[in-house]
Amino acid sequence: MSNIKPQEGIIGLYDILGYKDFLDNNSFDTAVKDIDNVLKTISNSDKYITNKIFDIFMRSHNANEIIVKKLLRQMRWFIFSDTIIQVSTFKKDERPGSKYNKWLIFLIASLVLNRYMFNSGLPLRGAITTGNFLFRKLCFAGKPIIEAYELANSLDLSACVITDEAYNESATLINSSKYEKVKKLFNALIIKYQIPKNDKSSNTDNQNQKSLFTLNLLVPKALKLSIIKKDVDLYKCVLNKFKMHNKRVTEKEVLRKVENTKKLFECLIDFAKTNKIT
């Protein structure tokens, strides 16, 4: 790997919660079929994710279709068992305007991925980082990938968090945009939330928590349908997503993740109402 030069960019790392249970409780053919659908969806050549990202991006500002599709092609996806890695790199002399476009596309793609996977009964926990790293084919090295891995695995719920460094860089670029719709979208996409972290306690009141920037999966205008329909039992809705594909949801650790995810969604719903983005 001596000929590989470090690259600056963005990394998103996502783990599928309950993946082992999913494999254990389904036939090989069923598991392969479901995973194949996931792979097709997160591929940047897939019509679903491309069209959704393009629709959101075009709605936020007057983007050229050719430029948007070029940015989508430049973003890379890698899948290792229960882990999905999303990568976007910057050129050495990348212009701020180009960086801004890549950040916005990246965040929207992450939103689409997380929402699709939750709706498909394969909730994710993930983290978005930025910095210098090495990657070639399927080999990764560098602080951002380690940071994303450790942060994602520390989450005790289904959520996608963003490091302070990643948030500050994206916020500086995007909030300097001349497009008010872009700034409004960005400031609705990310909120600060007390994220519950893994510990050995079964008592949710005693869990370690950390205030982290968190992707808002309930931004209604980002997709035509919200994850949570109005007047639904929120806990039951989240529980059903965790139970899909014959997954067992009986262990205290899993039920705690369900409860923590429900609390996050309650916060996101309140945020939407307060900020009139419903």
Protein language model features and the residues they cover:
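Catalytic-core segments of nucleotide cyclases and related cyclic-nucleotide turnover enzymes
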Residues: 99-104, 114, 135-152
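A short glycine-enriched loop-to-beta-strand structural element that forms part of the catalytic core
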Residues: 79-86, 122-134
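Short, solvent-exposed loop/turn segments at secondary-structure junctions
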Residues: 19, 133, 167
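Catalytic strand-loop-helix junctions within cyclic-nucleotide turnover domains
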Residues: 89-99, 127-139
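Catalytic NTP-binding/metal-coordinating core of nucleotidyl cyclase/transferase enzymes
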Residues: 2-112, 119
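A short acidic (Asp/Glu
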Residues: 22-24, 89, 136-143, 171-174
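Intrinsically disordered, glycine/charged-rich C-terminal tails and inter-domain linkers
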Residues: 157-160, 164-278
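Catalytic/regulatory signature loops of cyclic-dinucleotide turnover enzymes
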Residues: 115-126, 130, 145-166
